């Protein structure tokens, strides 16, 4: 079983681990957050240079982001001993980062559904992007994305990303489906798989944006109450069709391998694993587009080891490390120069994870961001993430 992003929505009890001993988851939304006022830490001045390492680095991360093969060389080169706590969800990350990391944590590998909570909670602070040399090699849309850059201030450096794809059986679908409508179709009752995650409400909203234009949805993460209700009702109607709300990639892989499901929302990792095993599956991004995740290394407001943190962010942004992580984790690197290295690690690895896709591919993805009550237009009539969580419990219960 691959241990990685798929544990995000599973309760995790992992404690502080010494990484060296560890064996081991677009149309952009403008300047999200700009209308919410000034983040509490915007005035904290980032350093102009990186000094000597403090000798240690404490990280909160998704399991799989701190593999020994790239952590050990970092420790040897910098003298920064890496310690990590693996978090099981974005909400757990936000909780652990309370009070600016509590003078304990230095960095967190936050996803888009946590970024704004951390930024506006005052738990992370701006960084000097000029101290990350490889940032210039990033995909343009990940240099200053709205989910981690507010009012021109960078609250972290983008890392890896990926889309939520429509995975389907080629035995059942002789021609590729063109719409997300298939996962809401009674024709496939009991044969649909869906991620067990409240952010799935955004996927429903994205579909409704074109399926029911009268709702006026323009951003699947900024929903008024009527728009939110429509998405929730769609997902409640879908419930009898769902074979499994999956929280591990291995669960969805097994269902497709066994022929128990024929269509579902997935990530590139599931597809590549199934194809490698000879399963008759393919994927597409439907006409409505897709949601997706993008992770960011964010610096704790009260980080006790900022120099080691900057050294880590710079190291993890290099093509070699991004390529290794992408292949190990099953996602797409932010650094464009990682593509050829991915192919040396896994034949066809670059194409398998869309690292060489044209910009038109990336513009079909709406990346996760935290649903807040204050909409991007300044109105306070959007449904916040707490209500998303409550609704998801009702949908899946």
Residue ranges and their predicted role:
Residues 363-397:
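Conserved C-terminal helix/tail region of periplasmic/extracytoplasmic solute-binding proteins
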Residues 60-61, 65-67, 92, 104-105, ...:
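Extracytoplasmic ligand-binding site segments that recognize negatively charged/polar headgroups
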Residues 300-366:
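Mature extracytoplasmic/periplasmic domains
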Residues 118-127, 150-153, 273-285, 349-350:
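Ligand-binding "clamshell"
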Residues 105-109, 245, 262-267, 282-283:
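Paired acidic/hydrophobic, glycine-rich loop segments that form the ligand-binding mouth/hinge
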Residues 35-118:
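Early extracytoplasmic/lumenal segment of secretory-pathway proteins
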Residues 21-42:
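C-terminal region of N-terminal signal peptides and the immediate post-cleavage residues
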Residues 266, 275-328, 397:
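Extracytoplasmic/periplasmic substrate-recognition and gating elements
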